[in-house]
Structure formats: structure tokens, C-alpha cells
Swiss-Prot record:
Listed PANTHER family: RIBOSOMAL RNA LARGE SUBUNIT METHYLTRANSFERASE M, RIBOSOMAL RNA METHYLTRANSFERASE FTSJ DOMAIN-CONTAINING PROTEIN
Entry's EC annotation: 2.1.1.186
Residues of the active site: 307
Name of the protein in its database record: Ribosomal RNA large subunit methyltransferase M
Native organism: Shewanella denitrificans (strain OS217 / ATCC BAA-1090 / DSM 15013)
GO cellular component: cytoplasm
Family recorded in the similarity comment: Belongs to the class I-like SAM-binding methyltransferase superfamily. RNA methyltransferase RlmE family. RlmM subfamily.
Pfam families: FtsJ, RlmM_FDX, RLMM_N
Any one GO MF annotation of this record: S-adenosylmethionine-dependent methyltransferase activity
Keywords: Cytoplasm, Methyltransferase, rRNA processing, S-adenosyl-L-methionine, Transferase
Reaction(s) this enzyme catalyzes, per UniProt: cytidine(2498) in 23S rRNA + S-adenosyl-L-methionine = 2'-O-methylcytidine(2498) in 23S rRNA + S-adenosyl-L-homocysteine + H(+)
GO terms under biological process: methylation; rRNA processing
Amino acid sequence: MKNLFLFCRAGYEKECAAEIQQRAAEMNVGGFVKTTNNDAYVIYQCFEDDGADTLAKMLPLNSLIFARQMFAASELHSDLPEQDRVGPLVASLLEADVTKCGELRVETPDTNEAKELSAFCRKFTVPLRQGLKKVGVLLDKENGRRPIIHVCFVGPGKAYVGYSLSNNSSPHFMGIPRLRMAADAPSRSSLKLDEAFGAFLTKEEQEMRCRSGLKAVDLGACPGGWTYQLVRRGMMVAAVDNGPMDEKLMETGQVKHYRADGFRFEPPRKNIYWLVCDMVEKPSRVAELMEAWAINGWFKEAIFNLKLPMKSRYKEVRVILDTMGEIFKENEIDYRLQCKHLYHDRDEVTVHLWIFPEKGVSYAEMG
């Protein structure tokens, strides 16, 4: 297939397009982007007939900042006949030799206009699933190890059809995790950290590295949205902020409130596992703070937000992440770095930093 379909947040098409253009070029998969502002998706059209297949297989989705989900796609079906919408979509998959898939997702971009098609998509899934099973494109039973068929309706009668590989795909419909806001969470920002843990760590990794007894620091904690997520996972938290903290959080006995500036705070003990930070500040300044903590060896893993500028957002993030990498190498710090524009992020990205990952969890245990 020649087209790579990428879901993103509406308004971030340019960033998603710039990123896929750069990453595809690094992999020698030539092509060009097609996108429209606020459509919430980007098409990367490859010059080679199998270019999108290469990207769907070899370009890790979790290495992309602005794409929520991606799949190798056909050309746009721009006028699907009302009397038979199934036939052309099935034919496209057969022509591309897509068979024995384990799941079907009929989706739309994440815009109010496209979501008006959601009811139709749910109804259409039934006859489409039957049609795909009949010709062997879809297995009779769901199989989480097989490719996933995607049909994305971008308008009435207009759809892209294709596939993603189960080991390089978001497990979530449209790439959007469905998280519930806890009634006792101090603020909606709590969902950002909840989503971040799920985005950057598997369930098994969370059980090992987000467990009860670990020490954590939350810089810029007030009123406690991010602290809440650490507390509910059983951690002991130093909440750093000049503002007031949520009373219920303080009553848990797991939080110590330091009335201080997050940029000047130094932890009294250095057995911290998690450092989290969601401060409204210049992204370069937050990055420098994380670099300083890493060089001092004050934490093991960090999740922090970088607020984005109005222009050149992808370029700015790329420069900051590359600079962090250079500084860590200069200081002989082994690290892993991931960055994602999460669903619950707005004009910001969330970064996960893991320092000396080969050392494991033990040295930062509560002691």
C-alpha cells in the first residue's frame, strides 16, 4: 500500500506531517504529505507501492510524538455506493493481499464533524465484518496477535481502508484511551498522568515500577492532580508547591507538602524513584530542570510536560529532546526517552525519561 494514515489531534496536522516526513526520509521511504487543518489526520503518500507497508512494520508508533495511531491504507474511496459500501472496501484489501486479520475497527478522525458518523460506523461494522470473514480477510474469532483492519470514514461515503500490525499499533479505538475522571481527583490534569503511565509502561511494567512503597516527588503539585495518581498507586509523595494542596490527599498520610519553588527545591533524601512535573513554564526551562535532577542522580524515572509554543512546535520539541540526549551523553548517563502528545494533553507534550534503566527498581526502594 502507498498511503500511511496517521490519526492526530485536530490542529496538530502540521506537526504530525513534519514528523512523518522527517522520520520516513530517515528510513529512505520517499513520499509527500497530504493534510488539511483541523481534519485530525495526515496522509503520507509514498512513492513506492509498498512504502506504507514498510512504515507500518518498521517505524515504531511509540517513537512518534504527534501520531495517536497509524495504518497502511488504500487510496481514498471517495464515493462508496449506498447500496454496496462493503464490496469496494473488501476488494481493496484483497487486492493488497491482506488476509487472516484478527480484528476490525471502523473509525473516524477525532473531530466533531467526523464523529457525527459514529452511529453509522457502529451499524456498518456488522455487515462489513460478515463480508470480510466470508472471503478470509478477517478470521472467524478475534486474535490479538494478527493484523488489525482499519476503515476510517473521513466523511459520508468517504473512507480509507487498510491494516496495522498488532505489535505496532495502539490498542485503543482511534488511538484514544477511555479513562474515567475519578470523583475525588483534585483536578482534570490527573488524567494526563494516568494516561502517561499507560502510554509509556505496559501493565506488567506498571506493576513493577509504579508500586506501593516507592518514593516520588511532584514539582508544581498544587492542587494535587498528579500527586493523586501517585498516591492511588501506593507511593509516598513529596508535593512541592507554594500553593495549597487538596485536603483529602493530605489526609491519606502519603503526602508531605513542601511550600517551595519547584525550580529551587532539593530533596532531603535521594531515594526517589518517580519525579513528575506539570508546571506552566517555558519548555526549555523545564527540560533544564530535569537535566539537573538527572545529573545529580536524584530520581530514577520522570514524567513531565513541556508546554508548546504557538509556532514551530515540532521543531521546538525536537531541539529540546535532542539537547537533553546530548547532555546526558556528555555526563555519561544511560537513558531512555519517549515523548507523546497524549489525548489529555492540549498545547503540550508529555515526556518519559528513564535514567540508567539497566539498574532496575531496587536501589530506589522506600527505605
